């Protein structure tokens, strides 16, 4: 029983709490309605006061005054309406003028934009033609330089070939002279020690002549390279054309000087006259060496050729 009574008490308390909430909400609604009614009463009271003030004013004035005032207000209102119509007309005219001006401005702007547009195709073609012209000028310059270098190289090669041919001719002449001296010198006297030296020098002359030809070809190639470098420097730095011309002239004249220097004297062999008998040497085993018949060792041709081979690279 106690449990049931406690449960009933709790349920009753809940019902009472819900009823209290409902009553609170109802009281709030009643308060709001009372405030609205109060405001309505205040407005009615204000309206009543306004009506009473208007009645007092109307009672103090006659109907003629009221009519005059109404007519005056009508005139004012008609003037105001007329001004409004004029203002509307002015506004419409202004809008039409502004629309016409904006239309002209748009047309002018569009025409300017169309006129000022770049033709990318024409610009690209113009730049390509400019590049082609520049490349053509460079090619012409390179062709001129190459032509000049080729002409200089041809001149150097011709001079080198001429020098080599002259040296070969001189070498053949020296060989012939040496052969003649050997033939006609050995028939009247026996072979001496100086003849052996002469034969060895003739062999050395043959070998050194070939070496000198190789050295001359190498020196010609070095001169050709130096001429090419001088031509390139002449066209790359236009401030020193006189110096380059001087160096090329010196290189061109170098083989000519060497040519004149390589002319070796002919070998002369003196033989004993037929009436004179050769003197005996100290050991009495053969004829003595004739000092006048020995060729001068300092005037051989291989020394001059070696000197030329050493002088040519130095220049």
Swiss-Prot record:
It comes from the Eukaryota. Residues 201-222, 238-315 are annotated as: Disordered. Residues 32-99, 156-183 form a coiled coil. The keyword Metal-binding does not apply. Keywords: Coiled coil. Residues 246-269 have a biased composition (Polar residues). GO terms for cellular component: FAR/SIN/STRIPAK complex. Transmembrane segments: none annotated. Pfam families: SIKE. One of its GO terms (biological process) is negative regulation of hippo signaling. Disulfide bonds: none annotated. Belongs to the SIKE family. This is FGFR1 oncogene partner 2 homolog. It comes from Drosophila melanogaster.
């Amino acid at each position: 029983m106690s449990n049931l009574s406690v449960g009933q008490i709790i349920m009753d308390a809940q019902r009472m709490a819900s009823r209290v909430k409902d009553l609170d909400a109802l009281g709030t609604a009643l308060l709001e309605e009372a405030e609205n009614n109060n405001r309505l009463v205040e407005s009615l009271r204000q309206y009543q006061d306004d009506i009473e003030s208007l009645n007092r004013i109307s009672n103090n004035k006659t109907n003629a005054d009221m009519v005059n005032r109404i007519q005056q207000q009508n005139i004012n209102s008609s003037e105001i309406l007329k001004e409004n119509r004029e203002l509307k007309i002015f506004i419409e005219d202004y809008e039409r003028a502004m629309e016409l001006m904006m239309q002209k401005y748009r047309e002018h702007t569009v025409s300017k934009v169309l006129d000022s547009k770049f033709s990318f195709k024409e610009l690209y073609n113009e730049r390509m033609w400019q590049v082609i012209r520049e490349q053509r000028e460079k090619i012409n310059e390179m062709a001129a330089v190459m032509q000049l270098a080729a002409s200089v190289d041809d001149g150097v090669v011709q001079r080198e070939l001429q020098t080599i041919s002259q040296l070969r001719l001189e070498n053949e002449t020296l060989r012939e002279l040496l052969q003649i001296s050997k033939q006609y010198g050995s028939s009247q006297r026996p072979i001496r020690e100086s003849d052996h030296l002469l034969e060895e020098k003739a062999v050395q002359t043959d070998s050194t002549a070939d070496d000198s030809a190789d050295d001359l070809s190498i020196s010609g190639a070095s001169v050709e390279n130096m001429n090419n470098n001088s031509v390139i420097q002449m066209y790359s730095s236009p401030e020193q054309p006189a110096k380059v011309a001087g160096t090329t002239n010196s290189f061109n004249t170098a083989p000519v000087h060497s040519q004149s220097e390589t002319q070796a004297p002919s070998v002369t062999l003196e033989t004993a006259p037929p009436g004179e008998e050769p003197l005996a040497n100290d050991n009495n085993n053969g004829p003595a060496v004739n000092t006048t018949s020995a060729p001068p060792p300092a005037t051989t041709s291989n020394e001059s050729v070696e000197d030329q081979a050493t002088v040519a690279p130095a220049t």
